[in-house]
Swiss-Prot record:
Family (UniProt): Belongs to the thioesterase PaaI family.
Source organism of this protein record: Schizosaccharomyces pombe (strain 972 / ATCC 24843) (Fission yeast)
Keyword Hydrolase: yes
Entry EC number(s): 3.1.2.-
Protein name: Putative esterase C31F10.02
Keyword line: Hydrolase
InterPro entries given in the database record: ACOT13 (IPR039298), HotDog_dom_sf (IPR029069), Thioestr_dom (IPR006683)
UniProt GO cellular component terms: cytosol; nucleus
UniProt key word Hydrolase: yes
GO function term, MF aspect, one: fatty acyl-CoA hydrolase activity
Region forming the signal peptide: none
Length: 161
């Protein structure tokens, strides 16, 4: 279910963090630069992605490696929704594939959640949904955030408007 939060401080901040990913021109910018951030509230971000050829495996389905990259990105954006500009470093990440996620031209949704943000460790989860809102994969991401919490670009006082 989409959360309509257009224009909020949280959505603006999350989009600015995503723009920094793109501007850095690293891995995320090359693999999933066309992701759209639909909504964001503290602790939750919803994104969509229209699948292109470079997102697919040789069988024409969404590649598991792309789902892993999106788990990483989704976790980072969920932490951005809590005010972190830099989201720390990965400790552990896993994905569970329930069914094929889509083919060329189909759109998927990501529901990224910050399950817990502590003073050292953060836990995030991402549900991957088809355009008909069926969950086809789940991702979990644990990050070390202690150093990230001190970044001057953080906006740790984000709250819903």
């Amino acid at each position: 279910m989409a959360i309509n939060s257009s224009g909020t401080k949280v959505l603006s901040f999350v989009r600015s963090v995503w723009q920094d990913f793109v501007n850095t021109n690293g891995f995320d910018a090359h693999v999933v630069s066309d992701i759209q951030i639909i909504s964001a509230v503290p602790g939750f971000v919803e994104c969509s992605l229209k699948l292109q050829k470079h997102h697919l495996n040789r069988m024409g389905n969404l590649h598991g490696g792309c789902i892993a990259a999106l788990t990483d990105l989704g976790g980072s954006l969920a932490l951005a929704s809590r005010g972190l500009f830099i989201s720390g470093v990965s400790i552990d990440m896993n994905q569970t594939f329930l069914q094929s996620g889509g083919t060329l031209g189909s759109s998927i949704l990501l529901h990224a959640k910050c399950d817990r943000l502590g003073s050292n460790i953060a836990f995030t989860s991402v549900d991957f949904l088809t355009s008909s809102n069926e969950v086809f994969a789940k991702g979990r991401h644990t990050k070390f955030v202690r150093n990230a919490l001190g970044d001057p670009r953080n906006c740790l006082d984000l709250a819903e408007d």
